[in-house]
């Protein structure tokens, strides 16, 4: 798992990583820096790998590079959620990431540009954030998309970043203004359609 994510995002950004399973019913996992916390129910779930990938991805997106402001929380959760699909794409030959994202895009998600405290950790922030990243990947192509991701992680390591700073980086590496695309995916109501 670590090998796959480092191939996508760049070197693991911290000194250590571990996981702790507790005998409690939390109903969620938590990505504390260098140590993910899972409850027993999640650890025994058939989708435990998805939880593990999500929390491991947070070591890059959330722990090493964190959202500058709470309104940018989609950067942490969108990247970690998209990592779940990237993991499947790399480890399951039958997985079609475009079909999966199209299926997800058929659902209704509220705008996430500034979700506010009551909606900060809703599915909209996680899933629409992942869809925004997939739309960016479609638009700029794999080579540029993963260059954006790796550069974001490298330049922002042990720091923070904002949506505007990600847009500026993506625009620089793509050689054109990516802002309108990203802003549509974060703010438009209804949400845009995926192009592939």
Question: What spans do the regions from the language model cover?
Answer:
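Juxtacatalytic substrate-recognition/specificity segment
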Residues: 1-59, 63-72
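Extracytoplasmic/secreted proteins, especially bacterial periplasmic and envelope-associated proteins
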Residues: 4, 33, 47, 51, ...
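Structural helix-adjacent loops and short alpha-helical linkers that scaffold large soluble proteins
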Residues: 10, 90-96, 137-145, 171-179
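A short alpha-helix capping/helix-coil boundary motif
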Residues: 26, 38, 111-114, 145-148
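Histidine kinase transmitter module recognition
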Residues: 41, 155-158
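Short hydrophobic/aromatic segments of transmembrane alpha-helices and their interfaces
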Residues: 41, 45, 63, 115, ...
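Non-catalytic accessory/interaction domains
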Residues: 57-60, 110-111, 143, 158-196
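Acidic/His/Gly-enriched intrinsically disordered linker/tail segments
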Residues: 71-140, 150, 156-157, 183-188, ...
């Amino acid at each position: 798992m670590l090998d796959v994510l480092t191939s996508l995002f760049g070197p693991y950004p911290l000194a250590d990583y571990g996981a702790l399973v507790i005998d409690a019913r939390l109903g969620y996992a938590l990505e504390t820096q260098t140590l993910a916390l899972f409850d027993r129910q999640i650890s025994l779930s058939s989708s435990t790998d998805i939880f593990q990938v999500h929390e491991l991805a947070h070591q890059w997106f959330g722990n090493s590079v964190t959202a500058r402001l709470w309104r940018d929380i989609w950067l942490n959760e969108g990247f970690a959620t998209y990592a779940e699909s990237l993991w499947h794409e790399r480890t399951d030959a039958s997985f079609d990431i475009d079909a999966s994202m199209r299926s997800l895009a058929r659902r209704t998600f509220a705008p996430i540009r500034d979700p506010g405290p009551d909606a900060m950790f809703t599915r909209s922030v996680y899933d629409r954030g992942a869809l925004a990243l997939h739309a960016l990947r479609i638009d700029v192509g794999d080579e540029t998309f993963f260059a954006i991701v790796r550069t974001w992680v490298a330049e922002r390591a042990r720091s923070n970043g904002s949506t505007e700073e990600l847009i500026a980086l993506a625009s620089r590496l793509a050689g054109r203004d990516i802002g309108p695309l990203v802003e549509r995916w974060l703010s438009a109501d209804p949400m845009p359609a995926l192009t592939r």
